[in-house]
Amino acid sequence: MLFPVLLLLKLVIGALIIDASALSWHDLKWPRDLRPLAHHDLLYMGQISEEDRGDFNATLRNFLVPRVVGSQKHREVREFIVRSLKDLDWDVEEDCFDGQTPHGIKPFCNVIATLNPSACHRLVLACHYDSLLHKEGTFIGATDSAVPCAQLLYLARSLNGKLQNQKTRGDGLTLQLVFFDGEEAFERWSSHDSLYGSRHLAQKWHEDRTSAERLESCLERSEIANQIDRMEVMVLLDLLGAENPRFYSYFGETQPVYRRLVNIESRLNDAGLMELPRRRRRTNYFSNSSTVGFIEDDHIPFLKRSVPIVHIIPSPFPDVWHTLDDNEQNLHHPTISNLNKIFKAFVSEYLQL
């Protein structure tokens, strides 16, 4: 993601943040019924056992290594993602290609895992798995984006039974996980030196033609001409793992979806299920406010092709962003655990698990 944009956000955020309740955005109709989770289901999603914590931490350790494009560790991380999702009986595709970079031709591979490839519509959760080539030393990128990668795999594992049941319903909706390669610039962020994987995949899916007649249970009035059109919404996770992040709704079109995250966090707080320090009574990660989405990230190539976007990235960025301090020691595990609860409930609610 682009650093000058962060500076711009800090300068104008006071002028641009708008109370969502003052807008008509929350009255927009989403094409799907976003019914709140039943209370007992919310309580279930808000419980994380010690076994779950151990599973998540074990998963995370596989990502807490330098993951520079073209390196051995980068390849091992990709293989771990593929193996983990194949073990859960997901359909896994590797979108591999060679790309021109300031450091010459480099190999890239996006990983796309789809629970039910026949389903017409897709709830897409995404992150990037590569790490920055840092000039000053070994960069781990714990928030950027080891934690988001581990969270996606954790969601697939922890919800596996419910997801497999949903897969057999034939309701035309499925979960898709996308792990982008080559998000980071090799030298200086530009339209050519960044977002290698997402630019390639967006173009590929735009050119991959299909139709509603060939797919399972498309919604009425759905206009499906290519794979891009099957993306009902992309939820992009980035820079997660620092204490007390602050998120905003960056796109009016997806305000109804973003508000589900606000609501879920509030309900989990009401139920006493969030992990809090003694001095705090509630978390307040998901602001009930909107701001203009200036940040450049892997969603941009899809946004340009009219894919609805929810961008879960903190503003401001974590203090450790693009420094060698973005490592395991500076992660805040209670915050990560709280976000895992929110994401589990969100996926369960959206897919009506």
Swiss-Prot record:
Which processes are annotated in GO (biological process)? peptidyl-pyroglutamic acid biosynthetic process, using glutaminyl-peptide cyclotransferase
Effect of gene knockout: RNAi-mediated knockdown results in reduced enzymatic activity in midgut and salivary gland tissue extracts. Weight gain after feeding is reduced. Females lay very small eggs which fail to hatch into larvae.
Q: According to the record, what induces this protein's expression?
A: Strongly up-regulated in salivary gland during blood-feeding on the host. Peak expression is detected 48 hours after feeding begins.
Signal sequence range: 1-22
- Report the CDD domains cross-referenced here: M28_QC_like (cd03880)
Q: What is its EC number?
A: 2.3.2.5
Task: Enumerate the residues binding Zn(2+).
Answer: D144, E184, H322
Q: Which InterPro entries match?
A: M28_QC (IPR037457), Peptidase_M28 (IPR007484), QC/QCL (IPR040234)
Q: Which reaction does it catalyse?
A: N-terminal L-glutaminyl-[peptide] = N-terminal 5-oxo-L-prolyl-[peptide] + NH4(+)
SUPFAM superfamilies, per database record: Zn-dependent exopeptidases
Q: Does the keyword Secreted apply?
A: yes
Keywords (alphabetical) are: Acyltransferase, Disulfide bond, Glycoprotein, Metal-binding, Secreted, Signal, Transferase, Zinc
Q: Which GO terms describe its cellular component?
A: extracellular region
Catalytic residues of the enzyme: E183 (proton acceptor), D238 (proton acceptor)
What are this entry's molecular-function GO terms?
glutaminyl-peptide cyclotransferase activity; zinc ion binding
Which cysteine-cysteine pairs are annotated as disulfide bonds in the entry? C96-C109, C120-C218, C127-C149
- Keyword RNA-binding listed? The answer is no
Q: What switches its activity on or off, per the activity regulation note? A: Strongly inhibited by PBD150, 1-benzylimidazole and N-omega-acetylhistamine, in a Zn(2+)-independent manner.
Q: Report residues carrying sugar chains.
A: N57, N288
Give the UniProt subcellular location, in the record's own words. Secreted
Q: In which tissues is it expressed?
A: Detected in salivary gland and midgut.
Task performed by this protein = Responsible for the biosynthesis of pyroglutamyl peptides. Seems to have a preference for substrates with neutral or hydrophobic amino-acid residues at the second and third positions.
Homology family: Belongs to the glutaminyl-peptide cyclotransferase family.
Name of this chain's protein: Glutaminyl-peptide cyclotransferase
Q: Which organism is it from?
A: Ixodes scapularis (Black-legged tick)
